[in-house]
Amino acid sequence: MLLILELLVLIIGLGVALPVQTHNLTDNQGFDEESSQWISPHYYPTPQGGRLQGVWQDAYTKAKALVSQMTIVEKVNLTTGTGWQLGPCVGNTGSVPRFGIPNLCLQDGPLGVRLTDFSTGYPSGMATGATFNKDLFLQRGQALGHEFNSKGVHIALGPAVGPLGVKARGGRNFEAFGSDPYLQGIAAAATIKGLQENNVMACVKHFIGNEQDIYRQPSNSKVDPEYDPATKESISANIPDRAMHELYLWPFADSIRAGVGSVMCSYNRVNNTYSCENSYMINHLLKEELGFQGFVVSDWAAQMSGAYSAISGLDMSMPGELLGGWNTGKSYWGQNLTKAVYNETVPIERLDDMATRILAALYATNSFPTKDRLPNFSSFTTKEYGNEFFVDKTSPVVKVNHFVDPSNDFTEDTALKVAEESIVLLKNEKNTLPISPNKVRKLLLSGIAAGPDPKGYECSDQSCVDGALFEGWGSGSVGYPKYQVTPFEEISANARKNKMQFDYIRESFDLTQVSTVASDAHMSIVVVSAVSGEGYLIIDGNRGDKNNVTLWHNSDNLIKAVAENCANTVVVITSTGQVDVESFADHPNVTAIVWAGPLGDRSGTAIANILFGNANPSGHLPFTVAKSNDDYIPIVTYNPPNGEPEDNTLAEHDLLVDYRYFEEKNIEPRYAFGYGLSYNEYKVSNAKVSAAKKVDEELPQPKLYLAEYSYNKTEEINNPEDAFFPSNARRIQEFLYPYLDSNVTLKDGNYEYPDGYSTEQRTTPIQPGGGLGGNDALWEVAYKVEVDVQNLGNSTDKFVPQLYLKHPEDGKFETPVQLRGFEKVELSPGEKKTVEFELLRRDLSVWDTTRQSWIVESGTYEALIGVAVNDIKTSVLFTI
């Protein structure tokens, strides 16, 4: 019988109306002078995984042994999600029963196990970054790993290092660790290690340039009815080559060095090509230059093409369907990928690499699923029993929720400890804090953000915003936390314990009563908030990204009313990022200001502990707070007539993001990056530097690749009957299968490959590559800097000396000052310790866009050690 396999260009083809010419790299990589457009060069083929010497070799040996025995259908089943709500998790792959591989469970998110019962809502990435505590970065990762493992999750969709947080109004900034790539990289690497120590694979996201939520997706009424219907394409993040390497790619390199198993590509375009089909970003930067050995998974329906995304390096499609096509049974992959392999549009070697990378990542991270570690929850119902496949009401009714409590003393303690150490003391005049029960006998608490939301906390993806802030909204939230403690609960409990007269006024608009009560209070605490989240939820007109940096709920007027009537007013800011504080920061009656990011379930406990002195503040700002809102990089809201919005603000600011911009332009911020007061004073002195390893200008050549491998099963493509849908299987309409229908006929695929397309693998790595996270030499210690720190106060406390590096002033490359080290040390009263910072070769390097490699310039460098980027206490020079 003659069999014809149709290849639909709509489903499998390019899927994008973008230029496909090759592009020569220039000083501004990605910017084409001739067309005056940002264009991503093509890079082919996808580097085959498992060829780095000494890296993941055991994992690849095991993976290759399995894949070599698999059929095309079995391999495809690993690459494609089964469809939205067609499994217990937010993402479920197909299974390979013949080899004991069940459906893989992929579950959000960076703050905890989303959409499950009894899970802990942990402090956000932003709050975690504010601790500047490497030990807590790891412990939080371990606690997350324990809970994901206990719920039967195989792949945790976090941590987030994209967004980098370059835009103060960015909706999802709270998920990541702050507005600095070095801080983000250190925190992400530790989080990944903690997760994967607990046999849960981490998935670092969003790759790359996902700096705003507005226009992150093309218009689709099923996704967001408020989007401009003329938006034909997602926004393009236009990023120059040097900024790409020194800023946006930096924390991904740390993540890969830490052994992360998977990377999630984002919805947006990068230099006018969609992230999940951007061969330069995935094949070249991620898999070739950074030596990534795991697999790339799409954000949910961020895949915009079939064959094109496959040859561009995408390895897994989630949740399987097309954008806006939930539960339609339509996919770019699944059956269509099977077709594309059989008619040789997608080389079978590429499919082999996808499947091998997925299995190797499972082995390398010890997250390979077992029969006793399967999901014990449903993401889509809170009931104990429900349909096996939520969307298919004809599927069997089974026990879907086992109500497993994944928390223990370690996870509870870690959540509170991170929350406490993340809180930043911004102002503390007249020793207002900690609160002294002897001085404060009458205490007033006010503000909507102090108490519970009238709607409770089980709103869709934490979209209840008329109460205390625990998380931002969206898929990065936990959803159904076990409990949440408000500031009202804990502040009132401490007031009772200290026998204070206490009152709480929630009203924030009619200020008559609060003004009257404040005039009689010895101290007034005002808790305020500003919230953001993911763009699929629109709250008070905010489409994920904030419309402004103003406090919510009339809070500026509330603070003014209280402060004008109480000479001892404490403002507690709870927010997902920077807020405008100019209306009250210098008010003489506002004697203390505290900032807290989304602190998770124990938010109220942590805030009260800091205010009442049960814990000392030791957090530092992971971003810059400006005096003028004009100093923030704006959110792009302009949609051009062609319906293809572009974000050129990233290119315009280039390397000058957050504190780099303020320092370079000599702009005084309200609160600088790294700023944070303490209840003690410290002395920083006696900086010394020593060379650990000779550093040449250029990187050494990396080790050669191991030999390319093949499974020698190309004859499979001659037997499409092997892929027919099993005649005895029950077929669910919405489910995404890898099988072919038996009534199709076979003809040659007619696919227009991009110019420069090739299937020939490299035999040698490029100079900046060859190792996990890049050339191994980048990760060698080049210099060590020591400094003495001493606690001059009266209580044991934690102190964070920070090292900023200043490059040679006469160098070829203009390089802004940048964070290159921090340590958190505990010191008892009078105690002195020597703190050591290690400067890696990469910390000294700049990206040479001409040589397309990292180089170390000769000249005099200065290591600046201080307590904030603009508060340097001592420094030391060294010459290379």
Swiss-Prot record:
Signal sequence segment: 1-17
GO molecular function: beta-glucosidase activity
Reaction catalyzed: Hydrolysis of terminal, non-reducing beta-D-glucosyl residues with release of beta-D-glucose
Gene name in the database record: BGL2
Family (UniProt): Belongs to the glycosyl hydrolase 3 family.
SUPFAM superfamilies xref list: (Trans)glycosidases, Beta-D-glucan exohydrolase, C-terminal domain
Protein name: Beta-glucosidase 2
EC number(s) stated in the UniProt entry for this protein: 3.2.1.21
Keyword field: Carbohydrate metabolism, Cellulose degradation, Glycoprotein, Glycosidase, Hydrolase, Polysaccharide degradation, Signal
Pfam families hit by this protein: Fn3-like, Glyco_hydro_3, Glyco_hydro_3_C
PROSITE patterns in alphabetical order: GLYCOSYL_HYDROL_F3
Protein's GO biological process: cellulose catabolic process
Highest taxon above the source species: Eukaryota
Gene3D superfamilies attached to this UniProt entry: Glycoside hydrolase family 3 C-terminal domain (3.40.50.1700), Glycoside hydrolase, family 3, N-terminal domain (3.20.20.300), Immunoglobulins (2.60.40.10)
Pathway field: Glycan metabolism; cellulose degradation
Cited InterPro entries: Cellulose_deg_GH3, Fn3-like, Glyco_hydro_3_AS, Glyco_hydro_3_C, Glyco_hydro_3_C_sf, Glyco_hydro_3_N, Glyco_hydro_3_N_sf, Glycoside_hydrolase_SF
Keyword presence, GTP-binding: no
Sugar-bearing residue positions: N24, N77, N271, N336, N343, N376, N548, N589, N712, N743, N794
Originating organism: Saccharomycopsis fibuligera (Yeast)
Active site (UniProt): D299
